Amino acid sequence: MYKIRKGTPFDQSQIEKIASKAYKKYVDLIGKKPAPMVADFLKHLNEDYVFVIEDTDNSQIMGYAVIVLKNNEYWLENIAVYPTKTKQGFGTQLTRYVEDFVSKSASTIQLYTNLKMYENIDWYKRIGYSEFKRKTVDGFERVYFIKEL
């Protein structure tokens, strides 16, 4: 059985491990570590909204999502699922949970992903996000998406 709950500072090490494993395959493609691999998860856990999907049988976190509020807009800053747990619906469950959470306060949610993360771009389009711009930030080629909630 799985549940989604608010992340706590005690989850930091599991979240960092998931980020490292999930984004490792992009290091060579991008030429450096993707932003989620160097994110300050303790800061996110203390200052932003972090949700985890957890196996209730063994307390193992399967994935996480980080939501930040920037200029009165909600951003899905980071979402990842442990690589051996992909394609099992955990990312979709987390995304739906986040969208429901944000819909109580806002009518849209935004996100960005790296241009070279093709499967992420395709996935976001499949689940209803619309691309609205492309921009290079801190050396990362980013594709920006928005979704009406």
Placement of each model-derived feature along the sequence:
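Conserved N-terminal entry element of GNAT/NAT acetyltransferase domains
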Residues: M1-F10
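Conserved GNAT acetyl-CoA-binding A-motif
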Residues: V102-T113
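Conserved beta-strand-loop-alpha-helix junction that forms the acyl-donor binding cleft
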Residues: L111-I121, V137-E141
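Active-site acidic-Proline motif in GNAT/NAT acetyltransferases
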Residues: Y82-T84, Q88, L115-K116
